[in-house]
Amino acid sequence: MANFFIRRPIFAWVLAIILMMAGALAILQLPVAQYPTIAPPAVSVSANYPGADAQTVQDTVTQVIEQNMNGIDNLMYMSSTSDSAGSVTITLTFQSGTDPDIAQVQVQNKLQLATPLLPQEVQQQGISVEKSSSSYLMVAGFVSDNPGTTQDDISDYVASNVKDTLSRLNGVGDVQLFGAQYAMRIWLDADLLNKYKLTPVDVINQLKVQNDQIAAGQLGGTPALPGQQLNASIIAQTRFKNPEEFGKVTLRVNSDGSVVRLKDVARVELGGENYNVIARINGKPAAGLGIKLATGANALDTAKAIKAKLAELQPFFPQGMKVLYPYDTTPFVQLSIHEVVKTLFEAIMLVFLVMYLFLQNMRATLIPTIAVPVVLLGTFAILAAFGYSINTLTMFGMVLAIGLLVDDAIVVVENVERVMMEDKLPPKEATEKSMSQIQGALVGIAMVLSAVFIPMAFFGGSTGAIYRQFSITIVSAMALSVLVALILTPALCATLLKPVSAEHHENKGGFFGWFNTTFDHSVNHYTNSVGKILGSTGRYLLIYALIVAGMVVLFLRLPSSFLPEEDQGVFLTMIQLPAGATQERTQKVLDQVTDYYLKNEKANVESVFTVNGFSFSGQAQNAGMAFVSLKPWEERNGDENSAEAVIHRAKMELGKIRDGFVIPFNMPAIVELGTATGFDFELIDQAGLGHDALTQARNQLLGMAAQHPASLVSVRPNGLEDTAQFKLEVDQEKAQALGVSLSDINQTISTALGGTYVNDFIDRGRVKKLYVQADAKFRMLPEDVDKLYVRSANGEMVPFSAFTTSHWVYGSPRLERYNGLPSMEIQGEAAPGTSSGDAMALMENLASKLPAGIGYDWTGMSYQERLSGNQAPALVAISFVVVFLCLAALYESWSIPVSVMLVVPLGIVGVLLAATLFNQKNDVYFMVGLLTTIGLSAKNAILIVEFAKDLMEKEGKGVVEATLMAVRMRLRPILMTSLAFILGVLPLAISNGAGSGAQNAVGIGVMGGMVSATLLAIFFVPVFFVVIRRCFKG
């Protein structure tokens, strides 16, 4: 094939140009993201039961829905929360690769079976089914410079005019409002109701009748009488629009003609739909929209669309209102991609300089350089064909591929120059002869490197999704690299190169003259050293055994992890006050947190967005969350200004607040996989022991974890503590004896204390809700319940104290379930110096000491880490086996591949040493670096073994003579290609700033592995080849 293109160079150029054009078109169309879709697809079901406590919600809503979610394809696990705000969220997580649209449809179908079994109030509120990630893509905050504008005003405008618009954008999975839109609030006065012998039930019934929209028909509607000349719609009763109209609602007309109206027994106002949340941006009243990404959507495209839409809406905002982005994960995505692209160009420049150093011929250097854009652009075309995106992982693959793809072209050019010098042939003939010598080695190298990376593509879970990005990118680049080396590079050599003399390098002066002289002396010294080594192979095999033993020790001692942490420019702070703490107390702590960040960390913090009443641990008055946005990376130089350093200082200072727990934490490397770094542990009641037993087990586990501060830190329940609850018990026999309806009792309790949604009203053209509830002063104390009255069958007003008793109990404001069983989520982090894998192992060990019937499981990113840890050994083993089989097929020998494979531990030991010295961990990126090193180590060995084998078979050389000739001939291309690769990944290894954690994790390991593989392999490969050939003749 090479000879065909040597004779037809324009044909080769045409193919290369077509490939580059396809790649250029692909780049314009490929989406850009930080990561591909790595997190397993998830579908969430949300419902609301106004006024219900957590236990009631769990028993009447959560379990009913869960029990119908059976038989759904590819369901991995299911978790749910039920809280005392009456809300329930059930999240179903599916195996990677599941079509999220199909999953959503299946969940909706199952939900249809459960819906008729749910309370009427829940059905009336509506049940939503969304496919979205569990964490926020961004938070859009809205503040006003107008001092008269309240949070309710801002919230209502955002809810009415912005929220739905953003929800409809492509890529948006869910939009959560931090605030509430307006609602008509009827605040009942219990004393006045009793005075007029009215009940909340009377109020609700009259509102349903009088605040109603009637379809009244038409005058002259069809069928009409012959000759009818009039047709008009009839508008009869319509819904009310303002508090004045509601105040005039007639509750009762007395026999004397007097009228009791709603305003006589209640306060009517346009208030908030709920008062659960207080939002602030840098201490100013605000509203916020927490935007979650739809499953499979592109983060950058979605964020760009959101900002464009808000910019479009900005001119229509009320005077003084503006939008800010106090929490945005996308700048990190953009900058990290930019950093990798910059690294890509730096790698190309360094590789060019290495090639010019060794080749010292601009024409010769230009040939491998031309191969770089051809192969890289071609790889983009293949990524587009596979439906991939331009993301951190594919770009890492490109950076690794640069060193690999120029290798093939360098081998071709270097060998053509050598043949021209030694055989004094013109370029065309030299190229033909050269290609006949190295074509087998090129194919062998391609097979080996492909064999290393292809098994990665077949692994499951989120880890498999990461591996596939590298696998497809690198294998595509390798395949194209070999094709270019067999098609374009020979054609370029035959047309661009000029004949060179045998004294080509010796005639150079200056730096190149010194370099060539030094290198030639080194080659002679190296060849003599190899000759001596081959005379005492036993000693070196012993040294090799010690190296392998050291490799095993290093591997066992290397801490494990899933992905490295990153400074993403944002982080979160969770606030948890003691059970029963009020919203007012929580706000004071949030104000302290805001003051700390804006004053003590003003050099690093851009803004703080706080939400009172909301937390990832649940919605309650004693919970809060702060979204902290840091200043741009270029303004935060130095480790002391990194997100990790800011979080560490905040933990120390905010930990001194006595009124509650304040826990700052970093975002996970892949936001889709959770909300916090560290581990995510589910403690499960497997035997139906009950909430109290599960709580005791949780506290026991937390106590045991606290005894290991050297390994575990910030171990905490991701939930709300049990709190005092006021239990009201109705004596049904007494109630019936008094002629009181049980349904009236229930409706009165629900309305007065929890609030009842009645129906809707029209506010400025938008439908909003109408709520009835007792005014605040009538529901503050236990004795206020006794002031509630219901009317008996004979018209007498009966106080609740006549048929109820009450007492205090403890209960949870938030109940959790995992896979249909009661559970409690526990989060924590590995202590500095401890790997996440070791921390997880310790948690499992502690959990095994809990009482019988208490089980555990991992969820979120920890589930994926456990899965990846189990896959890693199999991945390395399969890669070893496949490489060996490919080499056996290439050499038609079972023994020669052994001499190649024996060199692999020499590269692995370098990866492990580098990782140990620079505090890297055994994570997914480490495994990619390890596999890359396996392939590259084998590549160097192939260059020597292939030549030695040919010299023995074609020229009849002895095994030692052939080996010495091979190492002498191949040392230059081995060092050149290895140095090119090492310098190609150097920018990754020394990177800092956005995305540097991942870049370092890849670069440091590969660089260390390549250094050791090169320095050790050039001495050990000859030993392995000679020993194997002697042991296995032929």
Swiss-Prot record:
Residue ranges annotated as Periplasmic topological domain: 29-339, 386-391, 461-473, 557-871, 918-923, 993-1005
One example GO MF annotation: efflux transmembrane transporter activity
Subcellular location: Cell inner membrane
Predominant cellular place of this UniProt entry's protein: membrane
Gene3D superfamilies with a match to the protein in the record: Multidrug efflux transporter AcrB pore domain, Multidrug efflux transporter AcrB pore domain like, Multidrug efflux transporter AcrB TolC docking domain, DN and DC subdomains, Multidrug efflux transporter AcrB transmembrane domain
Cross-referenced InterPro entries: AcrB_DN_DC_subdom (IPR027463), Acrflvin-R (IPR001036), MdtF-like (IPR004764)
Species for this entry: Escherichia coli (strain K12)
Record topological domains on the Cytoplasmic side: 1-9, 360-365, 414-441, 497-537, 892-897, 946-973, 1029-1034
Family per record: Belongs to the resistance-nodulation-cell division (RND) (TC 2.A.6) family.
UniProt GO BP: xenobiotic detoxification by transmembrane export across the cell outer membrane
Subunit structure: Part of the tripartite efflux system AcrEF-TolC, which is composed of an inner membrane transporter, AcrF, a periplasmic membrane fusion protein, AcrE, and an outer membrane component, TolC. The complex forms a large protein conduit and can translocate molecules across both the inner and outer membranes.
The protein's name: Multidrug export protein AcrF
Membrane topology of this protein: Multi-pass membrane protein
Expression triggers: Induced by LeuO, part of the acrEF operon.
UniProt cross-references to Pfam families, sorted A to Z: ACR_tran
Task performed by this protein: Part of the tripartite efflux system AcrEF-TolC. Involved in the efflux of indole and organic solvents.
Transmembrane segments: 10-28, 340-359, 366-385, 392-413, 442-460, 474-496, 538-556, 872-891, 898-917, 924-945, 974-992, 1006-1028
GO cellular component terms given for this protein: efflux pump complex; periplasmic side of plasma membrane; plasma membrane
Keywords: Cell inner membrane, Cell membrane, Membrane, Transmembrane, Transmembrane helix, Transport
Lineage: Bacteria, Pseudomonadati, Pseudomonadota, Gammaproteobacteria, Enterobacterales
Gene: acrF
